[in-house]
Amino acid sequence: MRSRHILFLAALLLATACGEKYTPLPPAPPPPPLPPTEEVPGDGEGDGGQETPEPEIPFKDVTIYPEFKEDFSESSSFLRFAAKVNGGEDFRYYSAHPSLSATNTKVMMMRIDPADGEGWGKGPQVITKDYTFYGSYSARMRVPDIRKAQKNIGAAAGLYVHDIDEKYGVSGIDFELRIADPTKVYLSAWTGKEGELNRISRTIDLATGKIIDCSYGTDDTEKGKLTDEQNAPSTVSAINGFDASKQFYIYGFDWKPESITWWIRLNDNSEKVTLWEFKGKELFPDTYAPSGIPVLPAHNATSFWHSSSRLAHGMNSAKEAPKYPFEMEIDWMAYTPFQDEIDKWKENGKK
């Protein structure tokens, strides 16, 4: 009996001791709120940022020509004679006319009218009705020799692509001759909005092989010289006796998404001589054509026009309007599309 009391007292003392040690603690206070964090822009791939929109791909759903070559052997053409007089003879255009400088050759004879206004497209012009795009362009041409009749004429002629889109601006490529001095060629591409045009350009004296200029900028302001792969080839061989008014030459350029190559051939059987192979990089940021290479279809044309600002190099006085109906001869003009490049553009643009 005594042992039972002893066990009871021991258990009571143990419970009392444990009860004193197991005093419940008050609940812990809540943690302080975290400081606000700034939202960091990201790429939208799990980092909590906003997705950066992809740049818009300029696109217009237009009819683009298949391959063609117009040799002007007939009085009519599938090409358009710009601003031609309707219902009567227009002395500015004579298709299938015997050449004044080559035997057994019929040409498109284009005569500039002293009454024509100033500017591209204001003089005689043969131009596609629909559009052309990435591809190879060429024309066999001869410009007039005006140096004895009017040495300070301000007139340009050449092979062009040109269009103005209301949203995206200008798409233009020029292979130009300025007839006050037909020993030089003027190569250029044009993008941007009217009044804010961007250009890349190269001027070459083909009679000597001298590259006079290779630069980029706005319509009338140089931003810098082009170097490295944008200035290739860095030298050009002279073409002995080159004079665009003395004989026909074949002028051309190849237009691709990443490059434009201007070239010349002495005749139908000769190899192309590369005058400029421009490979694009960002020259004009925050524009639809940052590389300076046009990105939209345009119209292909041969044109003869008066300009008081497109001066022949070193001839600042050569800006007079034409005093006589000087003639330009076009033997043929041709276009071969780079269809794979055009199809890729269509596929991307319609997404």
Model-predicted segments: where are they?
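Short, low-complexity, disordered segments immediately C-terminal to signal peptides
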Residues: 22-41
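C-terminal motif of bacterial Sec signal peptides marking the signal peptidase cleavage site
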Residues: 16-17
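Sec-dependent signal peptide recognition
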Residues: 2-9
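GH16 jelly-roll
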Residues: 20-22, 41-42, 46-351
